[in-house]
A protein has these predicted regions:
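Flexible, glycine-rich surface segments
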Residues: 183-263
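C-terminal regions of proteins
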Residues: 236, 245-305
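Membrane-embedded segments
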Residues: 59, 63-143
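Second-shell loop/turn segments in exported
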Residues: 58, 83-87, 192-198, 222-228, ...
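N-terminal Sec-pathway targeting helices
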Residues: 1-16
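Membrane/wall-proximal cationic-aromatic binding patches
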Residues: 17-80, 90-100
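Secreted/periplasmic serine-hydrolase-like ester/acetyl group-modifying domain
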Residues: 114, 125-218, 299-318
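Structural motif
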Residues: 55-56, 109, 220
């Protein structure tokens, strides 16, 4: 009888441990966060910025973080911005980061890169139903890496040199590697990418739109050039969504001739992300839109922004 009870006792103890650790590793307010490590790192990094000095915020997944370079916007237009994007970042995580940042900043504009809208923005892994069930029951199985972010300085959150350098670049990943895209220039017509917008996506898009309205932030949506990810059908899907919320949508995939992108030199990974060559062209074009259409001020020469010139000179990106 005692032998029979041992496995049961062990199982009960294990369940209790999983329940307790699940409670401990899920911080209050983070119940709907997919990647706590990424969200923590972003929140801590942007908190280093002087209060109420950022006029533009960029957010999205890696299409955003590999494209929008705050120091290029600063050097060319004097625009103070920050890139909140991150690798595979889901819309629910974008929302959590934005919500925190708006406690300390009063930006005029939020630029949401649209590729993240096609992600499954659920908190748990939906690719494996058993794993999803287990993660929902015991969140510690999902958030097991959170210990890496506890009691670490901001430059160690995320714990890679590349992440630390991106934090210095105000969220931008300055990647120079070249792997050419050799597919069709007519990718918008030929691509057959899934156009599904999942319920969680629609929920969090509305939450972001509402949060922007509450804080007097104008929301715009942008698709950066990416032969791997974009098509006319996807464009139409995002345009329809933006129309519902009266949000302006810029699809830069439609401006290949204007941007003068060269897909043999301007992509990091065969047409998925832009490298630094490509991002320079996109930012040079888009900074003019921010200046002319949205009247984002030029802060160069102002005492409160002297640190920007110093940081830009130290990085020497442009």
């Amino acid at each position: 009888m005692k032998k029979a009870l041992k496995p049961v006792s062990f199982l009960l103890v294990l369940i209790c441990l999983l329940m307790v650790t699940s409670y401990l590793v899920t911080p209050k307010g983070y119940e709907n966060v997919y990647d706590i490590q990424l969200v923590n790192r972003k929140i801590n990094a942007v908190s280093q910025e002087k209060e109420n000095t950022l006029d533009v915020l960029f957010t999205g997944d890696s299409e955003a973080s590999n494209t929008f370079s705050p120091f290029q916007y600063w050097k060319e237009q004097g625009i103070a911005s920050y890139n909140l994007g991150g690798s595979a970042q889901r819309l629910n995580d974008c929302y959590t980061v934005l919500e925190d940042v708006l406690k300390h900043q009063k930006p005029k504009l939020l630029v949401l890169e649209a590729n993240t809208l096609f992600r499954k923005n659920a908190v748990y892994n939906q690719d494996d139903s058993v794993l999803m069930w287990a993660e929902q029951l015991f969140p510690v199985l999902h958030h097991h890496n959170i210990y890496k972010t506890i009691n670490l300085s901001v430059n160690l959150l995320g714990a890679t040199k590349e992440n630390a350098y991106a934090d210095q670049c105000k969220g931008y990943y300055a990647r120079v590697r070249i792997r050419p895209y050799r597919g069709s220039d007519q990718y918008m017509k030929t691509n057959k990418r899934d156009t599904t917008l999942y319920p969680e996506t629609l929920e969090y898009f509305e939450k972001i739109a509402d949060l922007c309205k509450e804080n007097n932030v104008e929301l715009i949506v942008v698709s950066v050039p990416s032969p791997k990810n974009w098509s006319d059908a996807r464009h139409d899907t995002i345009q329809e969504l933006c129309n519902q919320y009266d949000v302006t949508y810029y699809d830069l995939n439609k401006l290949d001739n204007v941007l003068a992108l060269d897909w043999t030199t301007d992509t990091l990974d065969r047409g998925d992300h832009l490298n630094m060559n490509g991002s320079k062209k996109v930012n040079a074009y888009f900074s003019e839109i921010l200046k002319e259409k949205y009247h984002i001020p030029d802060h160069r020469g102002e005492a409160d922004y002297a640190i920007w010139d110093k940081q830009e000179a130290e990085l020497n990106l442009y």
